Amino acid sequence: MFSQFGIISNDDDIIYVMTAGEINEQKTRDCIWRHFDKLIIENDGEPTPEVKPELGALPDDLEAREHSSFEKQLEGKTISMQINPILNAAGFPFSMLPIPIVYMSGDRAGNVNNIVFRFDGDTCTMTWDEGDEHNTILCGMDGKARTSPITLAGMNFTAFSTAAWIDENTIEVHMRPVGGICMRKIKLSFNGHIVTLRPSSQMPISAMAESLALDVDSFFPPILHKFGLVAFDQLPGIIDAPILGKIK
């Protein structure tokens, strides 16, 4: 998925591994072969100098914050989430894993429901139902991620998760699956028993939509070209639309 390639060249005695994050694999292949010869250099016997990273680590972990007094009211309660019919019709029901493979599986994930939080000092757990699966992740609330095994769309993942109260009535959760290219971010805002869940992801859905828009001809016939551009332009707002719920 997303242009992950492993190429072995016996003639050049090299192994080339690449994860591009590009949806259109042919574009990645063209790029590889366009620059492939420049990647091969003669070995002069000298050790390869250490290369300093040019990019910093992604800010995956939420910083530690003060806990909210609302924890006592939320503890152990079940949050029932509404189903978004537009997302279901489009084939993108809201999932805790924003990666295409969970939507392409025959055992499709999506339609997160029955969310339960339990708090314990520097950690909390978040439990939810999705499809036929029931998962619980352990989230660090002290700025350090915790790991948890989860299963979605019939596939096993290890999730790195953190959580923090953004304000007295809003909790945010970050979850990144090991081996995945995306991190799911959700903010749950509470107004009495009413819950508003605002999803986002890293990489953003907008980046995926922009990449798809560049290849709109692959998805729509010429007569619908303009319609396709409009559809992809609106995709982030549809997929990341707020979802309402209620504390039972």
List where the protein language model places each region.
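Structural signature of eukaryotic scaffold interfaces centered on beta-propeller domains
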Residues: A163-W165
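Residue-level recognition of beta-strand termini and adjacent short loop/turns
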Residues: D167-N169
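A conserved acidic, glycine/proline-rich C-terminal tail/linker
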Residues: V173-M175
